[in-house]
């Protein structure tokens, strides 16, 4: 499986799930912690979208918050991909490495 990004710079949900499976390849929990933060940012992005509809008087504020959350998502996505490459989860072509399971 290849890591893919959506909207140009956000890691896809399927790639996040696959990375979660590979995160046990190293002892430290940094990959898992970053993925947890990414999930929270995505929840917040969805929440701000709801606020845009629910609170039209604060529409501009919530649009700004949503835009900021998307920027955080993009930063976290690129950080997670680079960390996965550093730790050997993925290769230079963003393909997941074979863990050698079942051999």
Residue ranges and their predicted role:
Residues 29-50:
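Amphipathic, heptad-repeat alpha-helices with coiled-coil/zipper character that mediate oligomerization
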Residues 1-22, 88-103:
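Terminal, compositionally biased segments
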Residues 38, 50, 60, 77, ...:
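Generic alpha-helix signal with a bias toward terminal, lower-confidence helices
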Residues 48-51, 55-58, 62-69, 90:
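Amphipathic alpha-helical coiled-coil oligomerization segments
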Residues 10-26, 50-60:
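Short, charged/polar, low-complexity loop and linker segments
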Residues 6, 24-35, 59-63, 67:
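Short, solvent-exposed segments of well-ordered alpha helices
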């Amino acid at each position: 499986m290849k890591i893919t990004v959506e909207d140009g710079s956000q890691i896809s949900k399927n790639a996040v799930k696959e990375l979660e499976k590979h995160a046990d390849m190293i002892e430290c929990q940094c990959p898992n912690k970053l993925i947890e933060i990414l999930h929270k940012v995505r929840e917040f992005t969805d929440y701000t979208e709801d606020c845009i509809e629910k609170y039209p008087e604060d529409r501009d504020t919530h649009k700004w918050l949503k835009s900021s959350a998307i920027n955080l998502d993009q930063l976290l996505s690129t950080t997670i991909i680079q960390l996965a490459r550093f730790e050997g989860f993925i290769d230079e072509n963003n393909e997941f490495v074979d863990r050698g399971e079942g051999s």
